[in-house]
Regions:
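Extracytoplasmic ligand-binding clamshell segments of periplasmic binding protein
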Residues: 5-8, 77-78, 132
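Solvent-exposed, polar/charged alpha-helical surfaces in well-ordered, non-transmembrane soluble domains
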Residues: 8, 12, 62, 66, ...
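Short, basic, helix/turn surface patches
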Residues: 1-3, 49-57, 103-107
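Segments of small-molecule ligand-sensing domains
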Residues: 70-76, 91-154
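Hydrophobic alpha-helical
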Residues: 1-17, 85, 89, 147
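Extracellular/periplasmic periplasmic-binding protein-like sensory domains
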Residues: 13-84, 95-97, 157-162
Length: 163
């Protein structure tokens, strides 16, 4: 992945050197930083973003966005990933209270854990994934929101899941 602060210069350099192909990253980015650092040269840039998009965001997620914006002055795609961490920890420990003081119990709980995802509309669940890629469930599940940067903002291309 590419750090949001580095993406504009990398995009700008590639475009100014004549590269016209696809540029993408597997990390969430900040449209404001791209606009300020690369401008129209960033058009067409694709990133796999944070954890939500307005189309699938629940009222709880919208409240988080509002509170985050008030506290930090702006909200961006990268910020979406921050909402989930504490919810996963708390819900996993509620599913198995022994996991509060026992890492082995926490890991065991990850294999079967599921809880309602309060940040998304519909019946999405909090769960751990990673079996296919890593042979064990050690990654928190968040929807993969694939975005394309165009004219100063991100447009969602599609939303996907991994196992």
């Amino acid at each position: 992945g590419v750090a949001p602060a580095n993406a504009p210069q990398l995009i700008r350099s590639a475009r100014e050197l004549g590269y016209q192909g696809l540029i993408s990253t597997e990390t969430a980015q900040d449209a404001t930083v791209l606009r300020e650092g690369a401008g129209d040269l960033a058009n067409g840039f694709i990133s796999v973003g944070g954890a939500s998009t307005p189309k699938i965001a629940s009222d709880t997620m919208k409240e988080f966005v509002s509170r985050y914006t008030k506290m930090f002055g702006e909200y961006n795609d990268e910020s979406n990933t921050k909402v989930y961490a504490l919810e996963y920890i708390i819900e996993t420990m509620k599913a198995n209270p022994a996991s509060i003081n026992n890492v082995a119990e926490f890991k065991k709980t990850m294999d079967t854990f599921s809880a309602p995802n309060i940040y998304m509309k519909g019946d999405s669940k909090l769960k751990y994934v990673g079996t296919t890629s890593f042979g064990q469930k050690r990654q928190v599940f968040v929807p993969m929101v694939v975005n394309e940067y165009q004219n100063g903002k991100f447009e969602t291309l599609f939303i996907a899941e991994v196992d």
